[in-house]
Amino acid sequence: MSKILVLGYLGLRTNQLDGQTVKTRDLYKLASQEFDDVDLYDTEDFKFKKLSIFKMFWKVITCRTIIYLPAHNNLKSIFPIIFVLSKFFRTNIHYFVVGGWLREFLANLPLHRFMLSHISGIHTETQRLKSELEMCYNFKNVDVFPNFRFFDFQPSRTQSDKLRVVFMARVNKMKGLDWIFNLAEYIALNRLEDKITLSFYGPIHDEDREYFEAELSKYPFAEYNGVLQPSEIHQTLNDYDLMLLPTHYYTEGLPGSIIDAYISGIPVIVTEWKHAREFVDNGICGYIIPFENGEPELIEQVLMLMNNRDVLQELQIGALAKRQVFAPPTIDFILN
């Protein structure tokens, strides 16, 4: 019998890299470092072998503790079965939440609320989500377990006459591509191409590919450099000055790209999504711009940093200090 099962979307077959898969892999690594007997089940297997769901159920009933990281569909459809099995076989479930959407998701799911209130623990990325679950649904089993990264990287800042701006996330309109391309248009119209570069990294969302490639082709100072493997991220970001993430997802949790920026010692400019102020100290390790109609301020802040390298350097120092908050925690509490 396995002591611990990590159950979630790891994306191992296709090497899919996004916030969900990276956090699930990191939790598996963390559990493997702390405990001797750790198994895993990658729910991506459902896409390739439908009958593998029975393999998952077998793993569920033969383990002591589940580290559970479901996305929306898994939580809605599979979790009720896992919950029932856990009660029959006395398995502890620890749900590590990815993102900040759970309160809204549960609004019309009273059965799911009941089940979640009776598992061993719900571990949210943000204090605000913890408070919402307690206040809205009277959950008593919630704590905060922030997103994290493994790192021993030491930045060595390189110098450039240009402000090197980077976007690293899913290449998706909802991550703020439209605002970044509006910035690019401003740069082009004001002939600032010799002062700013824009680089994009990340998997391209199929529905937005045509839009992204068309916009990218307009600006010779903008480039797409593909998908970074986890081992490449920090060394690559080290060659940039500033990260943009003007997300339109209001219920973002803690985007992993922000942690990676801090580890690499570069500040961020983000929209004020629901949890932004828990993770970005405005004016210290980056800037928070309005969630609605924040494009003018995005352009203003980028231009200000282009012209004030002393301010940029102070933000870089603040970003590097902030990274210590996201060092790997311990999870020995799951066996209590």
Role assignments for model-derived ranges:
Residues 282-283, 287-294, 304-309:
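Conserved acidic donor-binding segment of nucleotide-sugar-dependent glycosyltransferases
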Residues 238-252, 266:
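Acidic donor-binding loop of glycosyltransferase active sites
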Residues 117-154:
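Donor nucleotide-sugar binding/catalytic pocket of nucleotide-sugar-dependent glycosyltransferases
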Residues 263, 267-271:
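Short hydrophobic beta-strand element within catalytic cores of glycosyltransferases
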Residues 210-231:
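Nucleotide-activated donor-binding/catalytic signature segment of Leloir-type glycosyltransferases, i.e.
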Residues 304, 311-325:
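A short, well-ordered alpha-helix in the C-terminal region of glycosyltransferases
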Residues 196-210, 226:
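Glycosyltransferase donor-sugar binding loop
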Residues 5, 157-175, 179-186, 198-199:
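Conserved donor-binding/catalytic core segment of Leloir-type glycosyltransferases
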